[in-house]
Amino acid sequence: MQSFADAKEFFQYSAGQWQSRRVTHHLPFRRAESGGSNIQVETLEKDDPRIIEICQMHDMDASLSVGGSYVTWAGTMQWDKDDENHEGSTVFALIPDADNPRQGKLLRERGYAEIVPVAGEYHLDHEDGLVLTTEYETMTIYERFWFANPDLRLRTSTVKRFGGFNTTTFCMEERIQTSPVTATAAAETNPLYAISGW
């Protein structure tokens, strides 16, 4: 199991290209839907113009950010109609709490559920999983991310809307291309483990 000092390390470790497979359970309909996507994660330093811009967008002092990520995705879901697409991109900026680098605010230029700027709360739990809570106008999304091994990241999410749980999702994300930063981190953490192997 990977160990992280803070969320910045977690996102740096996530840098690279991922292939995601997921199953979403639509609880009111008692039906499940499968899907997949390709995800690209790029690490951004705190002085990156995109990080500064998103902090300004949220009226936050950019000097408080430790950096973040630029994420792009393209995918499909089983119930998609012809005119639906699941492509997009977003910038994450991390603002850790002053007294605890393992928790803080995660700023986005757009959310997944609503295409508006959104701020979530994050923390690393006792197993070094990243827990993210994001509140939108009509719903709250709870997510947990963790690494089963350096090339396999798992994610669960629950959407709560109008006082009840609407959907739950389980994702298995397999790394198909790493970044130099991630490869170095993996070699230091697991010197006998091949980053490209199982």
UniProtKB/Swiss-Prot annotation:
Tree of life domain: Bacteria
Record-linked Gene3D superfamilies: 2.40.128.20
Gene Ontology annotations of biological process type: protein-phycocyanobilin linkage
Alphabetized GO MF terms: lyase activity
Observed phenotype of the null mutant: Cells are a yellow color, 70% reduction in phycobiliproteins, grow slowly, have an increased sensitivity to high light and a long lag phase. The C-phycocyanin beta subunit (PhcB) in this strain is missing the phycocyanobilin chromophore on 'Cys-82'.
CDD domains found in the cross-reference section: lipocalin_CpcS-CpeS
Keywords: Lyase
Its EC number(s): 4.-.-.-
Family label: Belongs to the CpcS/CpeS biliprotein lyase family.
Record text on subunit structure and interactions: Forms a heterodimer with CpcU.
Biological role stated in the UniProt entry: Attaches a phycocyanobilin (PCB) chromophore to 'Cys-82' of the C-phycocyanain beta subunit (PhcB) and the unique PCB that is attached to allophycocyanin alpha and beta subunits (ApcA and ApcB). In vitro, and probably also in vivo, chromophorylates ApcD and ApcF.
Designated name of the protein: Phycocyanobilin lyase subunit CpcS
